[in-house]
Amino acid sequence: MSYLNLRLYQRNTQCLHIRKHRLAGFFVRLFVACAFAAQTPLSSAELYFNPRFLADDPQAVADLSRFENGQELPPGTYRVDIYLNNGYMATRDVTFNTGDSEQGIVPCLTRAQLASMGLNTASVSGMNLLADDACVPLTSMIHDATAHLDVGQQRLNLTIPQAFMSNRARGYIPPELWDPGINAGLLNYNFSGNSVQNRIGGNNHYAYLNLQSGLNIGAWRLRDNTSWSYNSSDRSSGSKNKWQHINTWLERDIIPLRSRLTLGDGYTQGDIFDGINFRGAQLASDDNMLPDSQRGFAPVIHGIARGTAQVTIKQNGYDIYNSTVPPGPFTINDIYAAGNSGDLQVTIKEADGSTQIFTVPYSSVPLLQREGHTRYSITAGEYRSGNAQQEKPRFFQSTLLHGLPAGWTIYGGTQLADRYRAFNFGIGKNMGALGALSVDMTQANSTLPDDSQHDGQSVRFLYNKSLNESGTNIQLVGYRYSTSGYFNFADTTYSRMNGYNIETQDGVIQVKPKFTDYYNLAYNKRGKLQLTVTQQLGRTSTLYLSGSHQTYWGTSNVDEQFQAGLNTAFEDINWTLSYSLTKNAWQKGRDQMLALNVNIPFSHWLRSDSKSQWRHASASYSMSHDLNGRMTNLAGVYGTLLEDNNLSYSVQTGYAGGGDGNSGSTGYATLNYRGGYGNANIGYSHSDDIKQLYYGVSGGVLAHANGVTLGQPLNDTVVLVKAPGAKDAKVENQTGVRTDWRGYAVLPYATEYRENRVALDTNTLADNVDLDNAVANVVPTRGAIVRAEFKARVGIKLLMTLTHNNKPLPFGAMVTSAVSYTHLTLP
C-alpha cells in the first residue's frame, strides 16, 4: 500500500464504520489499513472512501460519495416492513427522501399514517399544523424519536417515546383502516347424498342440499339460508321432497357504537336469558370490533359411530349440520350454528337404521366484563321456531352487562310479552387464583297454553378455573336451579301442554314420533348440572371430561350426557381411548359406547429426508364396543395425495359381531378433494347385510364487478384475490386454493376486524410472470368481501450484459429505465 493511501486512512477516523457487506471482497486490505490507522492520532476529518480498494482504474467505479454518509440506498420508494417500538405495524410502500449528512435517507410518513400507528399527534407541538400530505420530520419534532432503515431486512424501525403515544390497547387497528369490502353477490352450496342397499330393509336413497346466498352493498349484508331434503324407499310409494327456509336477514355494523344492527331473522344472545330465534330488529354490541387484548364458544362435539353413519345436528328446530362419518370416534368442530345459543341435538343414524341421539348443552362462560366495558343488546320482534307446535308471540328483550373496578361485573335484563314477564339480575367476580364466578337470578311470570298462571325463580351459578400448575382446565361448571313455578319464554309459546315437536300433516301422521321430540310442560325443568374439564397428563397426554345432568319437576326421569377421553402420543404414534353415555328423560335404558383408536404414520419408519409419498400416509386401527356385546374392529390406511396434499383418502376393513346385529366383515373407503373451484367427496361402505354409497359436493360462487369466481365453501367474511395474468398461482397457507385462468381466487375465510395476510406462492407462477409484491394485507369488517390486489407483470425475462464504451458498467452504477413498464432487476 502506498504512503499516500496510508496517510489518507490515517485521516479517516471512521473507517471502522464502513459496512462489511459492501467491501466483503477486500476485508484483508481494510483490516491492514485500519490497523495502521489505529496507531495514528484520531482526527475529525469526514469519511473518505478510496475507490482504489475496488479497482485500480477510477473510471471502473461509480460515484460512491453517497455511501460515505451512511446512505445505503438512493432516494426512492421501497416496500418495507414497518416496526414501531419493536412492534409490527404494517407492510407498505414508503417514500424515502434525502436527509442531512448524518441521517442518510429518511422516510416520508404523513400525519395520518403516524396516527394510524398509535402516535398522539395532538401531543406533538406543531404537528397538527402540517398539511395532510406533508412529510412529518419525525426526529426533529419529537426528541429521542428515531427512524432507521435496515436495508438487509427491508425493515423500517421507528422508535417514539411512550409519552407521545396514544393510550391504545395492544392489537388495536384504527376503524379507518377497516375495509367494508366490495359490492358482490355470493352463493354457498353443500350437497350430500347416500344410497343404502339393505338386504332386509330394501333400498333407500337420501339427499340433502343447503344453500346460503347473500348480497353485499356497501356496509349492508343481505343473507338467506335454505335447505332441501329428499328421501325415497323401496318399501314406500313415491318419494319425499322438502324445502325448508331457515332464515333471511339484513345486517350492518354501527362502528361508532361498536355494535351491529340486524333486521329480519336473527337470534338473541344466550348470555343472560336462553337464546331464542326471532323475526324483527336487534341492535347489539359486537365484541369482535375490540382488539384481542380487550376481549373476554360453539361447542366441540365428540361421538362414536358403530359403522358408517349419518350425523345430523339440530338447533332450535333447524338442521344446521349434516355429514357422513366413518366408524369409530369422531369430532365435529366446524358447526355453523343457527343461533348463538340453544342446546344442540345430535343424531347419529347408522346404516342399519338404528340411531343414537344426545343433547350437547350450548351456553356461555361466566359473563365477566373488563372494567369500564359495557355490552348490551336490544331486540324487538316475534318469536320464531321451526317447531309447528309453537306459536309466534311478539316480545321485547334487553340485556346489559357492565364491568366495574376490582374485577366485578353487574348484569341484568328483561323479557316482555303478552303471556310472559321475566327480569334478571346478576353479579360476577374475577377471584384471581380462585377462578371466575357469576351468580344471577331470574324472576318470571308465565301464562301456559292451558291459561294457568305461574310465578317462579331460577338461580344460576357459573364457574371457570384453570389450574396451570397441575394442567387442569375447568372450562365450565354450571348449575341452575328452578322452582316449580318457573318457565322460560319458549315454554309459553306452545299451543298445547304436551305433544311432539313434529310437523303436522293432513290425515294420519306418517312419521313415527321419537322420544326426543316429546315435550310436557307439566314436567318443567328443575336442576341442571354441567361440567367440562380437561387435564394435561405429562407432556403428551390429555384427559377430557364433559357431561350434564338435567332433572324435572313431577318425575324422576332425567337427561344424562357424558363424554370422556384420553389422548396420548408416544413419539409420533397417537392413540385415543374414549367413552360416551347418553340418555333422554323419556328413553328406556342408556346408549353407551367405548372406543380405541391408534394411528401410526409411515414416516415413523422412513428417513427424515425421505421424499416418499408414504410420508403423508398413516396406518390406523380402531375398536368400538357398545357395551351390549356388539364390537367392531377396523384396520387400514389413510393419508393425502397430490402436490398440495388436497386429495385425502382412507381405506379400512375389519370385522363386526356380537350383540343384536349379524356378524361378518365390514369396511369402507373414502376420497375427499379440496380444489380451487370447490370440494368433492365420495365413499363406499359395506357389511354383510348393508352396502352404502355416499357422495357430496360443496363450494362457493362469488359474483363481482370483474366477473364470477368459483371457490371452496365461503365463510361469513372472505377475500377475493385479484391478480390478472397470474393464473394457477397457489395461495399460501391454503389447501387447494389457486387462482383461476383469469388470475382470480377466493380465500374462503378471513378474520373480521383483524389484519389478514394474503400471499401468493411465487414458486407456482409461470416463467413469464412476475409480481411486484406477493403479499397483501387486508382488514375486513364482518361479512365483507374484501379485495386483495396483486400487480402481475407478464412478459419475457431477459439476461442482459450492459456495457459503456465497450467496458463493463462501473461498480455501484445506477441503472434506470426510460419506459415505465420495463422492469429491471440488477444483482
Regions found by a protein language model. Give the residues of each.
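Transmembrane beta-strand segments that form the barrel wall of outer-membrane beta-barrel proteins
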Residues: 162, 181-199, 220-232, 261-265, ...
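Short, ordered, surface-exposed loop/turn motifs in non-cytosolic proteins
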Residues: 74-96, 725-735, 805-819
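Structural motif
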Residues: 67-70, 83-84, 173-177, 299-308, ...
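Outer-membrane beta-barrel translocator/channel fold
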Residues: 235, 266-275, 440-525, 578-596, ...
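Conserved small/polar residues in nucleotide/adenosyl-binding loops
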Residues: 822-826
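Residues that define the transmembrane beta-barrel architecture of outer-membrane proteins
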Residues: 203-209, 242-246, 297, 392-396, ...
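Post-signal-peptide, soluble extracytosolic/periplasmic N-terminal scaffold domains
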Residues: 2-4, 36, 42-295, 627-702
